[in-house]
Amino acid sequence: MVYIDEHIMDFDLDAALQQVSEQRREQALRFKFERGQRTCVLAYLLLKKALREEYGITANPVFEYGEHGKPALVGHPEIHFNLSHCREAVACAVSTRPIGIDVESVGRYDDGVARYTMNDRELRLIAGAQRPDVAFIRLWTMKEARLKLTGEGITDDLKAALDDAGRWQFTTVEQLARNYIYTVCEERG
């Protein structure tokens, strides 16, 4: 299940900080800028909402971290989640199977970044698209959601991140009127 919130600047941050775990509060307050604090808190609140609505869990979630830094829920190894944020939105995905999500703002297309992160087939798709900026972000969110699902994070070879794409199921949602795209990745089967 996916939860999205676009109201990053529309809540009382001080009050929200009292609704999160001490672990998350400390993490949020390490951000230098308020927007970072807000997205950190809002992502956690979305996770709390998802856990309550999907699994009946009302306690504040506490995280433990895997080998590559991917968070997992303490006491609930059967529940998988992933969080992401961009300037326009915060996203949370929860499942009983490993899951990854990435949300990104649609910005100015940069051919240099594309050449560094995309393989030849992906570059052709972008070049042939009516909106290269959208095509690039669509592919980027797929790569990042896949890498977040496996816990790898951004790797040295981003060009190969989708080489095994047949193994994964991607769901991409384009909210172009709101200037963002998100992709959810789950393993097929």
Outline where the language-model segments fall.
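Core catalytic alpha/beta fold that binds nucleotide/phospho-ligands
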Residues: 1-189
